[in-house]
UniProtKB/Swiss-Prot annotation:
This is Valine--tRNA ligase. GO terms for biological process: valyl-tRNA aminoacylation. Its EC number is 6.1.1.9. It comes from Cutibacterium acnes (strain DSM 16379 / KPA171202). Monomer. ValRS has two distinct active sites: one for aminoacylation and one for editing. The misactivated threonine is translocated from the active site to the editing site. The lineage of its organism: Bacteria, Bacillati, Actinomycetota, Actinomycetes, Propionibacteriales. Gene3D superfamilies: HUPs, Isoleucyl-tRNA Synthetase, Domain 1.
Length: 870
């Protein structure tokens, strides 16, 4: 773990016990961020922990630092921080690390575009290499793998600082001493160690099999990284030839794969084709004999009802190939082009010539050429029929995936093992989901898995597989007997280190070795974040006090990736869940509820909105986004949060301006006791909501109470609170004591949401930090008041103010006489605070009448006061 210190030259130590003349929100983030860092306010000290129950451990998602910052980052990470701050105030030792997911394909792509380079592993290392002064992403300079990795490390360091500056500005209470990266030596050690353990138990294996392949990035892709997108295509009706001269017509959107056809498949119950099962036909253009077979996955109502099986056009082809034990006929290479060498199953010269016409071409060009040849040969019936088909894409790619036979590493995840699948489904039921319905997304994903987890990538900046392969006397690698390092040697890099018992000079020669050339998918490392941060196989004491963790926040789009992969790894390695609960955030959309994207021009830069409105305003808006629900972004809403933060400053200054209060026993006035009774209920409601991880509900009740407190209670009692030398000394003391008690409690209730403004006000009159103070409990507040009293007073104030608003006169306008009629219980409450009520409403004569089922006011207004000079 590395420690990074936040420094600033503009922060000044706070002057405690002094209320500023003009409170302001500006500068609070820098001021308090510096102080919190200097005081190590949020640092976790395992030596102070006696038992696991004392700790609240958070598995924070390590953001992909090569990505673009957007409001969704701020919202979801703020949600986590409100929970962390609440748990800290409840007395928990909060273990709240932060990490950066800095390896993998997104980082490589950013480095390529930023520096105008590409990795060519065949090139030697150049210690004096300098990136182009004017990078051109379209003319990338080839560099060695080592040079490329160095640039990845260099750029991620810059990106990581940008993220860290944002998180500090937002006020995340993470422990920056626990900072980690997914490419650090320690993370590599953990990833390689877990892999070796998986391999030893038979949970990780190497297989040469059909693989989803992205031709742009030249790498394998896992099922969890797929996106099904609409893709324009056309159905082509092709005739396959029977020995008797009849044709069997199929319809396909991929005629370029005709040379890879190994069978025709129809449903066993389809009467149209039952007489063909067990016979053979020959393919158009290439004259290759293929069988006609039955399989229940064939769709009778799709196209002609009979389909050609090619290796491989889609995942259905893979299933048919595997279950019907069909031959492999590969014609597409890793670059997405038709293989140059004519396949051995294409025999006659004319067919070979037709294949040579498409050899080396992209699939798009090959499709066009094949269709032209089919038209010329008369083997295509009619014109192509345009259609929109669903195609699998890599989530970060822009071309449909191909399926190519390659050798890859896998980890078992239940995709082909019902017992393991059921065990992982049961883990999902053990897990507490916030909100609960998100569990169904997990279950749907696990139930829909069709293969094991492919974890190898044909890329460069990632965690290497700790594997070498011995070379036989013929120079061929023995993949069945890999060479593995001792755990104590980890981390290792097989590309630059020889295995034990070999010399570097034996690399790549007969009788020597080769290193596994691939790296682990970034999810294979980030799936181990619970183990990385808790000290698994590094710090037994820390691990015992923090694992399994308590809380795993994430967005709903990564349930299939990050949630599931961590459950898999912890189940296999630790025999348990990695954490007790998962909290799912929604997306932040634009005001039209469309997903924000750079290409649409509807993104917002988080630092700009923080600079404009302040961090507390942004945090308020974030907390108003309910768990699991998408939330539209609107800058106008930030103004509401800023207004709340500013009101806390000004109302606090106002309250503290009344002077010192007394003891709780000095609170005797019915209005004061009623307000505190409401506060007591608020504490219970906010606590219950937070205990259910419903931060939005907690904020809503706090804010509702606060505005009523300011608009009604403060206005009602301010004359009495000022009157410390008058006849009602006890009433003034009661008001001032109630005010300070309420302010104390409300600051603590708001602290998880608005950490900067609450800390600022706390420093005016309290020692220490509001964030290390205790969460309020109902026992702190008197329970003798009637909570309905202030509700009735608020209703009366609405009427008294309303009569002035109706007549469009200032609120300072006196009411000569007023009569309030209401039910007896309401009248009794109003009489109890008659003195405060007449003062605040400037009513000279107030009478009450019992009757009716609602409050009714009759009033006579006096002359409006003269306008005050500005």
């Amino acid at each position: 773990m590395t420690s990074q210190t936040f420094t600033t030259s503009s922060a000044t130590p706070p002057t405690r016990g002094v209320v500023p003349d003009k409170p302001a929100l500006e500068g609070l983030e820098v001021k308090w961020g510096k102080i919190w860092e200097d005081e190590q306010l949020y640092a976790f000290d395992a030596t102070t922990v006696d038992s696991r129950e004392q700790v609240f451990a958070i598995d924070t998602p390590p953001p992909t630092v090569s990505g673009h910052l957007h409001p969704g980052h701020v919202f979801s990470y703020t949600h986590t921080d409100t929970v962390a701050r609440y748990q800290r105030m409840r007395g928990k030792k909060v273990f709240y690390p932060m990490g950066w997911d800095d390896n993998g394909l997104p980082t490589e792509r950013r480095v390529q575009n930023y520096y105008g380079v590409r990795c060519d592993p065949s090139l030697p290392y150049d210690p004096d290499f300098t990136p182009p002064s004017k990078p051109n992403p379209k003319r990338q300079v080839p560099i060695s793998r080592r040079n490329f990795v160095e640039l990845c490390v260099e750029l991620t360091a810059v990106d990581e600082k940008t993220f860290q500056d944002l998180w500090r500005a937002v006020g995340l209470s993470v422990d920056w001493n626990q900072l980690y990266t997914t490419i650090s030596p320690e993370s590599q050690r953990i990833a390689q160690l877990a892999f070796l353990r998986n391999y030893a138990r038979g949970e990780a294996y190497l297989s040469d099999a059909p693989t989803l392949w992205d031709v742009t990035f030249s790498t394998a892709v896992a099922q969890a990284e797929l996106e099904a997108r609409d893709y324009p295509g056309a159905y082509h009706r092709l005739g396959f030839h029977r020995p008797n001269g009849e044709d069997v017509f199929i319809e396909t959107t991929r005629p370029e794969l005709l040379a890879a056809c190994c069978a025709l498949i129809a449903h066993p119950d389809d009467e149209r084709y039952q007489h063909l099962f067990g016979t053979t036909v020959t393919t158009p253009l290439y004259g290759v004999e293929v069988p006609v077979l039955a399989h229940s996955a064939a769709e009778m109502d799709k196209g002609a009802g009979i389909a050609m099986c090619c290796t491989f056009g889609d995942l259905t082809d893979v299933a048919w190939w595997r279950e019907l034990q069909l031959p492999t006929r590969t014609i597409i290479g890793r670059d997405g082009r038709i293989l140059s060498e004519t396949p051995q199953w294409i025999i006659d010269a004319g067919s070979a010539e037709r294949y040579e016409a498409i050899a080396g071409k992209t699939t798009f060009t090959a499709r066009k050429l094949v269709v032209e040849a089919l038209v010329e040969s008369g083997e295509m019936d009619g014109e192509p029929k345009p259609t929109q088909r669903k195609a699998n894409f890599y989530e970060k790619g822009d071309k449909p995936l191909e399926i190519i036979g390659t050798r890859q590493w896998y980890i078992r995840n239940g995709g082909r093992d019902d017992d393991l699948r059921n065990a992982l489904l049961e883990r999902g039921r053990e897990l507490e989901w916030v909100p609960e319905h998100m569990r169904h997304r997990y279950e749907n994903w696990v139930e829909g898995l069709n293969g094991d987890w492919l974890i190898s990538r044909q890329r460069f900046f990632g965690v290497p597989f700790p594997v070498w392969y011995p070379l036989g006397t013929d120079g061929e690698p023995d993949y069945d007997h890999p060479l593995l390092p001792d755990e104590s040697a980890l981390p290792v890099d097989p590309a630059s280190q020889p295995p034990s018992g070999y010399q570097e000079s034996q690399r790549g020669v007969a009788g020597g070795f080769i290193g596994d050339p691939d790296v682990m998918d970034t999810w294979a490392t980030s799936s181990l974040t619970p183990q990385i941060v808790t000290g698994w196989e590094r710090d037994a004491d820390l691990f015992a006090k923090t694992f399994p963790m308590d809380f795993a926040p994430e967005a709903h789009d990564i349930i299939r990736t990050w949630v599931f992969s961590r459950v898999v790894r912890a189940h296999l390695e630790n025999g348990m869940l990695p954490w007790k609960r998962a909290a799912i955030s929604g997306f932040v959309t634009d005001p039209d509820r469309k997903k924000m994207s750079k290409s649409k021009g509807n993104t917002v830069v988080p630092t700009e909105i923080i600079d404009q409105f302040g961090a507390d305003a942004v945090r308020w808006r974030a907390a108003m986004a309910r768990p699991g629900m998408d939330s539209p972004f609107d800058k106008a809403q930030m103004k509401v949060g800023r207004r709340l933060a500013m009101k806390i400053l000004n109302a606090s200054k106002f309250v503290l301006g009344f002077g010192e209060g007394g003891q709780v026993c000095d609170i005797t006035n019915p209005a004061d006791l009623s307000m505190l009774a409401g506060l007591r209920e608020l504490i219970a409601e906010a606590t219950e909501a937070f205990d259910k991880f419903n931060y939005t509900a907690a904020l809503e009740v706090c804010e509702q109470f606060f505005w009523t407190f300011c608009d009604d209670y403060l206005e009602l009692i301010k004359e009495r609170a000022y009157d410390s030398e008058g006849a009602d000394n006890a009433g003034a003391l009661s008001a001032r004591t109630a005010l300070r008690l309420a302010l104390d409690v409300m600051l603590r209730l708001f602290a998880p949401f608005l950490p900067f403004v609450t800390e600022e006000v706390w420093s005016w009159w309290k020692d220490g930090s509001v964030h290390t103070s205790s969460w309020p409990t109902a026992d702190e507040v008197p329970a003798t008041g009637d909570v309905d009293l202030m509700s009735d007073v608020s209703a009366a104030l609405v009427e008294l103010r309303g009569v002035k608003s109706t007549h469009k006169v200032p609120m300072r306008t006196p009411i000569l006489s007023a009569r309030i009629s209401a039910p007896a219980s309401v009248i009794a409450n109003l009489k109890a605070v008659e003195s405060d009520l007449t003062k605040v409403s400037k009513t000279e004569s107030l009478t009450f009448l019992t009757g009716g089922d609602k409050l009714v006011l009759e009033a006579e207004l006096g002359e409006p006061p003269a306008k005050r000079k500005k």
